[in-house]
Amino acid sequence: VSGPVIRAAAKLGVPTAVHEQNAFPGVTNKMLAKKVDRVMITTPAAQDYFKAKHPTVVTGLPVRGEMLRADRDLSRAELGVDGRPLILSMGGSLGAKAINDAVKHMILSRYKDKNCYYLHATGSNGAGMIDELSKEIDLKENSHVMLREYINDMDRCMSAADLVICRAGASTISELQVMGKPSILIPYPYAAENHQYYNAKDLADNNAAVLIEEKDLDGEKLTAIVDLLISNMDKLKQFGENAKKMAVTDASERITNCICEIVK
């Protein structure tokens, strides 16, 4: 939608800028890059895909303020979580069947050990998973298994987590980075130009996440990777530290500065 407007504005000499959220740019932004005054990118990984009129500027992607302010210890206390690792998993607001199925297998395989907490959001399309698991697990007696349809306190849940299993949308990636969270990323395979794969690969290449393509995902594989990570907390900590190194915590300010520079 914005493509024709930006192109017309640039032709008229009106200051113009674009911002690319993903590690693999969309067609429109790549085309506009040759015309606009500023190309802002979320991650340096996107740099090589642009043939821009002016040098690209890494601004990061703004995240909600509550994600920046969340306190891990307070969040864990509010969730009733003790010192055991907390695994947070989700597949988006609608849910993702492949992720739900794999997480269900993982929980059923591991919950009896009671050495971890599991907080899983099924999404609206997967809400039946809660009833299915409640028939196999006494959730009152196993309070370390926490199932929800939707997470409306993401700042609290992600802050409290020791490992996050999720998709690889741009906003989610930025939140993982600013919070310094290790993750297992399962990109949505039908995203435009497969951009979630490249977002996940960016973290995996920086030793900040494990990337599993959905076509390769099953319960046994997910469980094995979780076992490997949870049994090596030093590695998990390193993943989190590497994610934090990639974070841009002043993205809004950087974007504002770029815009102000071209309208002076």
Predicted segments with their positions:
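A short, well-ordered alpha-helix in the C-terminal region of glycosyltransferases
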Residues: K235-T249
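Well-ordered beta-strand positions
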Residues: D37-R38, P55, R156, L163, ...
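An aromatic- and histidine-rich active-site surface loop
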Residues: V1-L12
